[in-house]
Each structure stands twice: as C-alpha cells, then as structure tokens.
Regions:
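Extended, well-ordered alpha-helical scaffold segments
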Residues: 4-26, 50-72, 99-118, 151-170, ...
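Intrinsic disorder/low-structure terminal segments
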Residues: 5, 21, 46, 96, ...
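Hydrophilic extracytoplasmic domains
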Residues: 163-181, 187, 197-218, 229-230
Length: 280
C-alpha cells in the first residue's frame, strides 16, 4: 500500500502541508497531543525525500521533544512525569539515540526515572509519585521503553512475563484487562500491552524497532518505480519443456501469492502515515 496514492489520495502530500505550518511550540504542547510527536517523527523521517523542508521539520520535532521534557530529567511532561509518557514517546526516536547526544541524554535520564516505577512482581506503576498498583498500561509502556533502550538494571524478560501472566485476558482472545475494572479493555490497556510486547519481540528477533518504517517506505517506492519489462513479441524458437496442462475444473485452490506478514507490515506502514496525518 502506497501512502502517496491511497485510494487515489496522496496522504503524504496532505500531511506535508499540515506539518510545515507547525512551530516547535505547536509540536510540543499547543496544537498536538505530545503522545503523537513520535509517530510524526517516524513519518517525516521515512518520507524525508518527499516532505518539504524535511531537515528543518525533523530538527523542529527534536527541539519539541526536548522542550517537552522536564528540567529535572524525569522525561516527558504530560500533566507531570509518568512511566506511560516516557514509554509512549521515546521509543520512536531510537534512530537518534546513537547519533544525537541531546536525545541520548534525555533518554538515559528518563530511564533513571522510569525504572523506579518497576515493582517487585515485574509490573510497573504509573509514576514515582503513584507507583501502585502495577497496571497494564504502564507495564506495557515500560516494556516498550526498556526493550528499545537496553538498561543493565532492567530485565525486560521479567517485564514481559509480568504482562502476559498478570494482565492477559483469561478468555484467550488476545485482549488485556483494565487493571482497575478487571474487564477486557480494547481502547487503552490492550494497545498499550501489545505495543510493549511487539517492541520486545522485535528486539529478540534482532529487527529494527517497529516504529521505524523507513525501509518499508523505501521498498514500496522502489517497487512502484521499478521498470516494467515488456513481454517479447518475437515467436519462441525453443521447444517447450512445459508439461501439458489439464483443463480447468474450476475447483482448484489458488497458490499462496505472498508473505502475509510482509503484506500486513506494509499496510501498517501506510496506516502510520495516515494516523499521524489525521491526528495532528
């Protein structure tokens, strides 16, 4: 799926027009939920050859990220510091961690804060101020954070097991529960838990982080721009080696046409661009 031609709509172009009107202040606090700054960075970075003034936009996003951090180094300020905010925002910026000292400093400092919210049973609380109870959302976000940014003081396998063992719905349908109600929660708890789990599993498999869609966008563009080989109109002089085919009965089963996992990931890549576009 090509986000530059999604059902005839160039989603990237529309996003381009919006993001180029935003100031650093708009990005960090006023016009956009700070939780979305990571997905915006991911999209601009992936489409940097398409989006106007992309270097400036990326620099502004980085400035907005740093401006959104509290002066005490506890990480993202969204009505105060929390495990959830650090885990929701910072993993999107993993590509800058090894190359940008300011981002690395902010991440490492936030890690010192977030690891304090990990409880003895492996679950995580909302914040240092409100460390209990360990809950699904905060546990998922802490797993996403520490799976992406390895920390010697944090055993991510323990965090993962605590989510699966304590918060997975007993019905076995892949849902996770709201810690406070005990009910399945598809709006918040399940997405947060799965975000942590997916990030963790990606790191175990040695894959790039799931928020970096750069390679997928490039693959889509390369496939779109690949020259189409015209079939030859010359008659073949070679004898056919193909066996004779039986007449179709109409009951044949079509062979697999591709890797479903790859297709779904490319679909998610396009959706990432669409999501960022419509939520800013």
């Amino acid at each position: 799926i090509d986000a530059t031609d999604f059902n005839g709509i160039n989603v990237v172009s529309k996003f381009d027009k919006i993001i180029n009107t935003f100031s650093v202040d708009d990005l960090s606090n006023n016009s956009m939920n700070i939780y979305h700054i990571g997905s915006v960075y991911s999209v601009v970075n992936a489409y940097r050859d398409t989006i106007s003034n992309s270097d400036k936009v990326l620099a502004d996003i980085k400035s907005a990220l740093l401006a959104a951090c509290t002066a005490d180094g506890n990480g993202i300020d969204n009505w105060g510091n929390s495990t959830d905010s650090n885990g929701f925002v910072f993993p999107f910026f993993a590509s800058l961690y090894d190359t940008d000292s300011d981002v690395k400093k902010a991440v490492d400092s936030a890690a010192d804060y977030s690891k304090q919210t990990i409880l003895t049973d492996g679950t995580s609380g909302y914040s240092v101020q409100y460390p209990t109870p360990g809950n699904t959302n905060s546990s998922g976000m802490n797993l996403a954070f520490f799976a992406q940014y390895n920390n010697p003081d944090v055993n991510t396998a323990v965090l993962y097991n605590s989510i699966v063992n304590k918060f997975k719905s007993a019905s076995g349908n892949g849902a996770y529960i709201n810690t406070y109600t005990g009910q399945e929660d598809f709006k918040s708890a399940t997405p947060d838990a799965l975000q942590g789990i997916i990030t963790y599993l990606y790191t175990l498999e040695g894959k790039t982080n799931p928020f970096d869609i750069t390679a997928d966008v490039k693959a889509i563009a390369d496939a779109k721009n690949a020259p189409v080989e015209e079939p030859s109109t010359e008659p073949s002089t070679e004898p056919s080696t193909e066996p004779a085919t039986e007449p179709s009965t109409g009951n044949e089963v079509s062979p697999a046409t591709g890797d479903v996992n790859v297709y779904m990931y490319l679909l998610l890549a396009a959706c990432a661009a669409t999501f960022a576009c419509v939520t800013v």
